[in-house]
Amino acid sequence: MNWSFYTLILGFCIDLLLGDPHGFPHPVVLIGKLIDALGRLFRALLPKTKSGEIAAGALLWVFTAAVSTAIPALLLIFAQKISVWLRLALESIMCWQILATKSLRDESMKVYAALQTGSLSDAQRAVSMIVGRDTERLDEKGVARAAVETVAENTSDGVIAPLLFLAIGGAPLGFFYKAVNTMDSMLGYTEPPYKNIGLVPAKMDDFFNFLPARLSAFFLLAAGFFLRLDVKNGWRIFRRDRYKHASPNSAQTESVCAGLLGLRLAGDAWYHGVLHKKEFIGDAVREIEYADIPHTCRLMELAAILALIVCCAVKACFIF
């Protein structure tokens, strides 16, 4: 029996209910430690040259992806030998830990709550937990914009893309995706010391997110339709601005959200003390408001539910 059909649904529901409880062990933390250890190892073994660092990044990517896929696969095989119900429970827990729907909402709503109280420093601190830019330079609108942007972008990376990988290959493929995404998050920067070692992880992340990012954009458009937002403008901005980002994937969902909400997102941002020039995404039909954070969360959640329905419908065609 194809248990991944049921574990996908169970894992999704558990994620909506529990999110990431504080203090609960998370496999992504272990993946991060593996990346850090392998990075130090391969950098020590290979020449301190551009080609040596690129090779270190390539080896790191292969080993991390392989280990992150093999361990959950072996655990599920052993669980199956003991009991199919143990396999069902274990894979459901794995699926839950791969998805990030509730945690993305919870963390972004902390930013919203801080803005509502009028504490800019608290809002900057809260948004620094979910974005990579230098948040101490942001004013209230900049903080709100950063929160909206990260929810929009992570609708693909944190929710729909892992959901698609889970639907195709169960928890092992889901963890493969999380490893790919985590390597890019930790190493995929254009500044030293990550520029060379992060090249392969960044390119592989672009490759594996190419289709999920575009599918996520369409799920967001569908969610916008059900929420009675400006889908026509969402489609227009998507077609116009979806490549206005250094990554070929990041602006796919961001452009849809900008169009649906009538906002202008992106623009110049500081990272690690360096100003990065970026194009704007969307048109400033209106000024951004604090309430746009929960609005974007609702878009993300409905898009995730629609993606789950489609994934389950497709899987059902092959199972039943």
Language model region names:
Residues 185:
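Glycine-rich phosphate/dinucleotide-binding loop and adjoining beta-alpha-beta core of small-molecule
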Residues 1-176, 180, 188-320:
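Hydrophobic alpha-helical transmembrane segments
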